A protein has these predicted regions:
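C-terminal secondary-structure termini that scaffold catalytic or DNA-interacting sites
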Residues: 1-3, 309-315
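N-terminal core-binding DNA-recognition domain of tyrosine recombinases/integrases
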Residues: 1-5, 12-119
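DNA breakage-rejoining catalytic core of tyrosine-based enzymes
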Residues: 99-101, 112-133, 183-194, 209-214
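Basic, Lys/Arg- and aromatic-enriched nucleic-acid-binding interface segment
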Residues: 129-158
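Short, charged phosphate-coordinating catalytic segments
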Residues: 151-173
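C-terminal catalytic core of Y-nucleophile DNA break-rejoin enzymes
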Residues: 182-201, 213-237
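Short, basic (Lys/Arg/His-rich) helix/loop patches that form interaction surfaces
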Residues: 232-281
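Catalytic-site neighborhood detector that most strongly recognizes the C-terminal catalytic loop/helix
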Residues: 283-308
Length: 315
């Protein structure tokens, strides 16, 4: 890849340096892995075109978009992920003085729906309380039911759920201590009596399987910690069966995956009257304003508010 600053001579060196920069900025290993995967596809595309990184222009980006959209059949959300990785990469190159500017920013504003429409979080599918009740009560498998109910009752991310160990559950006050992550400020989440019922049911089954790992959720095949795809499959097959998930639709609102539980959790707590700052605390959102650092919420008060506002699902 000729034409680029000689300090970094190969695409792999660039990727390695970029990944180190991402880690220094506090990004998760999973986010860095996804960025690198997208960037390797872009770099291979440039290699086939015999184009260097500092020679990329709008026409090359249009060609890459055509390649992703029409040859790889990438969906809109996937396209956004590709160009998010590219934008972060070109930000880094510009910061290091390896390119003159980030050419991705104006391109994605024009061609990608998320940025063209000027919103940051596309509308995800939102189930009613009755629909969520139908979903979780349609799940007979004790592990999958526990996953669905725990996601709905806590609003935690898929990665946070996967890292929960059995010992992280506090049965005295119905809380879970999550593993530390750069994305989260508050590590304690609460659950209610409905969630406790399905968790205990799953733990009885899990105990009979006698896994060596301390992971709360395990694979039936390997008896090891459940994977990201394992959680996805555990949710999507039931949502699809009830008509809540259409894998063939290009619209995000026609899809239902693990992150939709977080959207549901947030929306229904707010609709049930929970103060916004309490919802942010339960979600573990980063404190963005200086005054937030000095605003401490009493844990017991937060727990009472949670129990008053979290919807019942009739499990």
């Amino acid at each position: 890849m000729e034409g680029l600053n000689a300090r970094l001579t190969s695409p792999e060196e660039l990727l390695k340096s970029f990944a180190e920069d991402c880690k220094l900025r506090g990004m998760t290993d999973e986010s860095i892995r996804r960025y690198k995967s997208s960037l390797r596809i872009f770099l291979k595309f440039l290699e086939q075109k015999e184009v260097s990184l500092d020679s990329v222009d709008m026409e090359i980006l249009r060609d890459f978009l055509r390649y992703l959209r029409f040859e790889r059949k990438a969906k809109e959300k996937t396209l956004e992920n590709y160009f998010s990785a590219l934008s972060a990469f070109y930000d880094y190159l510009a910061f290091e003085g390896l390119v003159s500017s980030n050419v991705i920013l104006p391109f994605r504003r024009r061609y990608l729906r998320r940025y063209k429409n000027g919103y940051d979080d596309p509308e995800r599918r939102l189930l009613s309380v009755e629909e969520m009740s139908r979903l979780v009560n349609s799940i007979m498998d004790p592990r999958d039911k526990a996953i669905a109910v725990l996601l709905a009752k806590t609003g935690i991310r898929r990665g946070e759920l996967l890292r929960i160990d059995v010992d992280d559950i506090n049965w005295e006050d119905y809380s879970i201590m999550l593993k530390p992550t750069p994305k989260r400020s508050n590590r304690v989440v609460f659950f209610d009596d409905e969630c406790a019922i399905v968790l205990r049911r799953w733990l009885r089954v899990r105990e009979k399987l006698n896994p060596k790992t301390n992971a709360l959720f395990i694979s039936y095949n390997t008896l090891d910690r459940l994977s990201r795809n394992g959680v996805w499959n555990a949710i999507v097959k039931y949502a699809k069966r009830l008509g809540f998930h259409n894998p063939n639709s290009p619209r995000l609102e026609d899809h239902f995956g693990p992150h939709c539980f977080r959207h549901w959790f947030t929306t229904w707590l707010l609709r049930n009257g929970m103060p916004r700052e309490y919802v942010k605390e339960l979600r573990g959102d980063k404190r963005r304003e200086a005054i937030d650092i000095y605003h401490h919420i009493d844990k017991e008060e937060l727990r009472r508010a949670y129990l008053a506002c979290i919807p019942k699902l009739g499990v």
